[in-house]
């Protein structure tokens, strides 16, 4: 492997007891063990009273106010730059007047991708409140748990999602997928009734016309609570500040976009096929890209054929995606469903959120040879800021997740000695920079996750001599299913309540279609005839579809440390599960 060659080179010339080592590269300090970005620093706003929405709209170009900023891929219904400013301001006023939303209030967004998502998200922030997002396919139990943990005072949900809502203390307002600023957009009297509350808020909330007081909010106030599996254990609420998201906008989105402007790229048109409820999609399509005046073409749900058609129709130039979407595009091309003329406008495809195989990268480059392909790395805890791929005439390192973003620093820490490691050596990746979260909603394990401002990612990685980062494994237990994060503890909490299950541990297995799938190792109670199918059906009724257990292995005992901690690595690394299992079964990751 490349890192082995680097390490071997360091030991060259060791004869006669003399060790000759090359000087460290300029981006690495041997004295401190810290890696720095090779990009020039980016100046970030210092005004402590600045908010994210104010920053975005100050950055949004004033020229051409009628230019589309959000476009519904299916209908071509658009929100212009001027519309965006007006709709966010009026909806924020409606939230304050109609529902008493104020500084510190938490509003839960249970919404699918739509042009209404960014407007709703930014309006919550403009009202002085905190937004917390959820995948709209979440189960009633998951919705109730997050609403309770965050103290949500209001829920914004889609019409389809309303059917899954459990009884909640907070009121629910249904949000349409299309915004053309009038009730006439709704289909018939029933739609007008269903969305009447939202339309009333969108008109500013009515009242006597007196503006409610706008809360005083600053950079260090919370702006979002996004859920992540963290570095281990159960899902945790990640508290992000206005400062975090402003840094993300500048260091991730605007900086990367500037690289393509510098190359003389045409007007940027981005396809939003990633869920905006996740930090990857949220940071791009509901926040950062809106500040540069790009057009965001929103797919309500991904379909490879529809995506190809939308690329051709809207002349899409950039397509951020995750490995399963990338694989679907490759399959569509192999089946002859991607005419070259339809994707000729595509300049860049970026991939993140989950590991990707070298084979899939090769297949993609064969199918789309004109596209600049890069990978990136970030976490919810780093507000998606970490590294971004950067191809040059000299370097095209497609399997790397790229270079450190501006203003970011990293360490590679030895797993046993905790010493810092130079390029070519693998260890745990630690990150430091302005995107690092304020903390978890519950600070129970914050100290072990952050140390002196450093975020311990739980990922095993190394830097090469050019400053490119490679992820080679991980310490943490998170399962990445089609780009979605699944905390094993969440599934174990569901399974252990089954009356016929004595003990359980959930880990991951590699899967060609999904990247990874959840695998449940189950110890049945004495006399139980519980089947694999029954276990999977039990879980499926209580979690979002992407969280379903895809394989069940019945075992006699769960391996644990003397302290009682489940040794997931033994389960994950065991290639001969049949030797330990009494029986097993699985379902397709395509379901």
UniProtKB/Swiss-Prot annotation:
Similarity comment text for this entry: Belongs to the ATP-dependent AMP-binding enzyme family.
Keywords: ATP-binding, Ligase, Magnesium, Nucleotide-binding
Enzyme class, first EC level, given as a word: ligase
Binding positions for (E)-4-coumaroyl-AMP per the UniProt entry: 280, 353, 375-376, 380, 476, 480
Catalytic activity line of the entry: (E)-4-coumarate + ATP + CoA = (E)-4-coumaroyl-CoA + AMP + diphosphate; (E)-4-coumarate + ATP + H(+) = (E)-4-coumaroyl-AMP + diphosphate; (E)-4-coumaroyl-AMP + CoA = (E)-4-coumaroyl-CoA + AMP + H(+)
Record Pfam families: AMP-binding (PF00501), AMP-binding_C (PF13193)
Source lineage: Eukaryota, Viridiplantae, Streptophyta, Embryophyta, Tracheophyta
Name of the protein: 4-coumarate--CoA ligase-like 3
């Amino acid at each position: 492997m490349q890192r082995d060659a680097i390490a071997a080179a360091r030991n060259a010339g060791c004869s006669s007891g003399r060790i000759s080592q090359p000087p460290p590269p300029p981006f690495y300090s041997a004295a401190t063990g810290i890696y720095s970005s090779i990009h020039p620093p980016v100046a970030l706003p210092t005004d402590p009273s600045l908010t994210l929405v104010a920053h975005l709209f100050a950055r949004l170009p004033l020229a051409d106010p009628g230019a589309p900023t959000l476009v519904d891929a299916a209908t071509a219904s658009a929100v212009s730059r001027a519309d965006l400013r007006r709709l966010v301001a009026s909806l924020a006023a409606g939230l304050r007047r109609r529902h008493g939303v104020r500084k510190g209030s938490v509003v839960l967004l249970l919404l699918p991708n739509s042009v209404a998502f960014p407007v709703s998200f930014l309006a919550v922030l403009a009202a002085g409140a905190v937004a917390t997002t959820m995948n709209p396919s979440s189960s009633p139990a998951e919705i109730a748990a997050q609403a309770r943990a965050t103290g949500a005072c209001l829920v914004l949900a889609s019409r389809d999602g309303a059917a899954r809502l459990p009884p909640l203390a907070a009121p629910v307002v249904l949000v349409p997928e299309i915004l053309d600023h009038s009730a006439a957009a709704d289909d018939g009297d029933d739609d007008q009734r269903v969305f009447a509350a939202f339309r009333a808020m969108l008109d500013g909330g009515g009242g006597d016309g007196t503006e409610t007081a706008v809360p005083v909010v600053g950079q260090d106030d919370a702006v979002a609570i996004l859920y992540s599996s963290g570095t281990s254990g159960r899902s945790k609420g990640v508290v992000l500040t206005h400062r975090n998201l402003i840094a993300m906008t500048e260091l991730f989105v605007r900086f990367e976009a500037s690289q393509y402007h510098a190359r003389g790229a045409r007007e940027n048109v981005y396809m939003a096929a990633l869920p905006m409820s996740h930090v990857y999609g949220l940071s791009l399509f509901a926040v950062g890209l809106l500040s540069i005046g790009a057009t965001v073409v929103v797919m309500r749900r991904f379909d490879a054929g529809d995506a190809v058609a939308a690329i051709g129709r809207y002349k899409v130039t950039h397509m951020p995606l995750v490995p399963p979407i990338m694989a679907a595009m490759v399959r569509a091309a192999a089946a002859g469903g991607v005419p070259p003329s339809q994707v000729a406008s595509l300049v860049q495809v970026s991939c993140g959120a989950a590991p990707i195989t070298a084979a899939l990268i090769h297949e993609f480059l064969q199918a789309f040879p004109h596209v600049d392909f890069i990978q990136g790395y970030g976490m919810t805890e780093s507000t998606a800021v970490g590294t971004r791929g950067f191809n040059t005439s000299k370097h095209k390192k497609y399997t790397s997740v790229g270079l450190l973003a501006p203003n970011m620093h990293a360490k590679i820490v030895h797993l046993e000695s905790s010493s810092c490691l130079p390029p070519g050596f693998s260890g745990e990746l630690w990150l430091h920079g302005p995107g690092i979260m304020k903390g978890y909603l519950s600070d129970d394990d914050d100290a072990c996750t952050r140390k002196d401002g450093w975020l311990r990612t739980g990922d095993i990685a190394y830097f090469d001599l050019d400053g490119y980062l490679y992820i080679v494994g991980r310490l943490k237990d998170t399962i990445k299913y089609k780009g979605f994060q699944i905390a094993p503890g969440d599934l174990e909490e569901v399974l252990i309540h089954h009356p016929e299950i004595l003990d359980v541990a959930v880990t991951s297995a590699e899967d060609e279609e999904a990247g990874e799938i959840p695998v449940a190792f189950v110890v049945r109670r004495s006399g139980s005839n519980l089947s694999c199918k029954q276990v999977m059906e039990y879980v499926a009724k209580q979690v979002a579809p992407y969280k379903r257990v895809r394989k069940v292995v019945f075992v006699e005992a769960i391996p644990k440390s003397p302290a009682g901690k489940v040794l997931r690595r033994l389960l994950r690394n065991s290639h001969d599960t049949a030797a330990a299992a009494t029986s097993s079964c699985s379902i397709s990751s395509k379901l």
